């Protein structure tokens, strides 16, 4: 919620933000369920006014800075957030998979995984995660000021021969404003 309140009972009074990783944007054949004329975008957002599912009260956001424009025939290039951190530089084609986030004071913070192409992966899974970043997005008016977001490499990913460790998923604010 943009209001910061994470406890029960107030969702109907505010605006919620949903974050998505891979998203298909396009049309679906109603008879077959097959996707037609679509683009796959690596990260998108949605705003929902109130706390109940309602197609009239949800707005999906994609494209650079939330422009809602599909501007590239390349898969994934129409994401809201395109990696620009030091860790992303030189990594080849990479993207963010949005994970968890929270609103705190006048910013929303997201902890996306940094992912790149990996041709050695099995069919359909030619990607590998290689980092975690922090996105800091100003809250302005009734939404996010996506054009003014900041990206920071976060030291919350560790990989060795035995395992991968990620931090930054399923975190919640422990503040009175959040209902704690």
Which residue ranges define each predicted feature?
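Carbohydrate-active catalytic/glycan-binding domains of CAZyme proteins
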Residues: 1-180
């Amino acid at each position: 919620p943009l209001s910061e309140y994470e406890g029960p009972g107030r969702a109907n009074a505010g605006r919620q933000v949903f974050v998505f990783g891979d998203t298909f944007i396009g049309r679906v054949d109603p008879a077959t369920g097959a996707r037609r004329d679509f683009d796959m975008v690596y990260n998108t957002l949605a705003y929902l006014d109130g706390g109940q599912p309602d197609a009239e009260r949800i707005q999906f956001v994609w494209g650079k800075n939330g422009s809602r424009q599909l501007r590239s025939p390349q898969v994934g290039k129409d994401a809201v957030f395109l990696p620009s951190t030091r860790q992303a530089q030189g990594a080849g084609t990479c993207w963010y998979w949005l994970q968890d986030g929270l609103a705190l004071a006048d910013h929303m913070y997201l902890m996306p995984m940094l992912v790149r192409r990996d041709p050695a992966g099995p069919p359909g899974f030619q990607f590998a995660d290689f980092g975690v970043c922090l996105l800091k997005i100003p809250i302005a008016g009734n939404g996010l000021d996506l054009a003014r977001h900041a990206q920071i490499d976060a030291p919350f990913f560790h990989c060795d021969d035995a395992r991968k460790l990620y931090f930054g998923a399923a975190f919640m604010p422990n503040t009175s404003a959040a209902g704690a």
